[in-house]
């Protein structure tokens, strides 16, 4: 087991479902020393659970992290898009590395299987949205295999119980940021993102369907590119898999996927939350390894 002095000191801002699942993931890793879980409501179930796991908590939010800025190196921000824009003013001034799990689009957009190695010098890394983390690998794989994408549409369906307050409050930002990222990573001329929240009980597993009108010369190349990308995603999201292999009909390409969560804290059907947390952990692990390498040179 690594000594605490060799671990990256971590604070989690936000004590909802994403923050708590991150807490369990961080605590299970020998790379990190979890210092704080911080929220806004002293009586919240999230902070109560964190305390029961022997993690120091506070309901003073950003003010607490300002007062303890020397005690952590990395922050996972699992609040809201609006809150993150305020939070990052302090983190930027304080030189703190931030992994943003909101659709605020303040920092550099990251999908680990696409551009993780480019994140080394960034102060703020934005993980776009859960639907983005699911669909963007496939959108990027398409880009590698076709001549041009005229239109790209992504429809994600998630269980109502996995859509917390922050998710519902950020719907507009979710659409805008996902569509922006789809255009950026695929080069598509026009993009559209749709999020369906399914109230069915028991909760249904996250599913995402990608539709594209694209010009290509070899559809086998499309299939191969998508298959290769799925394996890259599965390196950090084991529950990621295709349910509809690439299909072509009258110029339209269809690909379907599902994400089964790891079940660290969230139920397995909440793959939408698990995939963005797995991406966050991949970014944090990369930064930890980069920092350790720099310290030995």
Curated annotation (Swiss-Prot):
UniProt binding sites for NAD(+): 15-18, 162-170, 272
UniProt keyword terms in alphabetical order: Aromatic hydrocarbons catabolism, NAD, Oxidoreductase
SMART domains the record matches: Semialdhyde_dh
Reaction it catalyzes: acetaldehyde + NAD(+) + CoA = acetyl-CoA + NADH + H(+)
GO BP: catabolic process
Coiled coil spans: none
Gene3D superfamilies to which the protein is assigned, alphabetical: Dihydrodipicolinate Reductase, domain 2 (3.30.360.10), NAD(P)-binding Rossmann-like Domain (3.40.50.720)
Sample GO molecular function, one term: NAD binding
Top-level taxon of origin: Bacteria
Protein family: Belongs to the acetaldehyde dehydrogenase family.
Name of this chain's protein: Acetaldehyde dehydrogenase
Organism in which the protein naturally occurs: Burkholderia pseudomallei (strain 668)
């Amino acid at each position: 087991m690594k000594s605490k002095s060799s671990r990256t000191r971590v604070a989690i801002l936000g004590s909802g479902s994403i923050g708590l699942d991150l807490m369990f993931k961080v605590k299970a890793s020998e790379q990190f020393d979890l210092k704080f879980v911080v929220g806004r409501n002293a009586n919240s179930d999230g902070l109560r659970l964190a305390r029961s796991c022997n993690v120091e908590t506070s309901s003073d939010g950003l003010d607490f992290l300002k007062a303890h800025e020397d005690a952590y190196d990395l922050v996972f921000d699992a609040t809201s898009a609006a809150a993150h824009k305020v939070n990052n003013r302090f983190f930027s001034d304080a030189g703190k590395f931030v992994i943003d799990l909101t659709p605020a689009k303040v920092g550099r957009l990251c999908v680990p299987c696409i551009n993780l190695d480019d994140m080394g010098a960034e102060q703020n890394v934005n993980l776009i949205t859960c639907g983005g983390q699911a669909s963007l690998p496939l959108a990027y794989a398409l880009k590698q295999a076709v001549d041009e994408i005229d239109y790209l549409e992504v429809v994600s369906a998630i269980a109502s119980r996995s859509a917390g307050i922050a998710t519902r409050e950020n719907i507009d930002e979710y659409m805008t940021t996902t569509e922006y990222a789809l255009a950026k990573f695929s080069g598509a001329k026009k993009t559209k993102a749709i999020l369906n929240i399914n109230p069915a009980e028991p909760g249904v597993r996250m599913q995402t369907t990608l539709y594209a009108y694209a010009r290509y010369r070899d559809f086998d190349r499309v299939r191969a590119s998508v298959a290769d990308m799925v394996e890259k995603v599965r390196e950090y999201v084991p529950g990621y898999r295709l349910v509809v292999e690439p299909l072509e009909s009258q110029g339209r390409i269809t690909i379907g996927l599902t994400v089964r969560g790891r079940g660290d804290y969230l139920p397995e059907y909440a793959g939408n939350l698990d995939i963005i947390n797995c991406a966050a952990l991949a970014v944090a692990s990369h930064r930890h390894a980069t920092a350790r390498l720099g310290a030995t040179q």
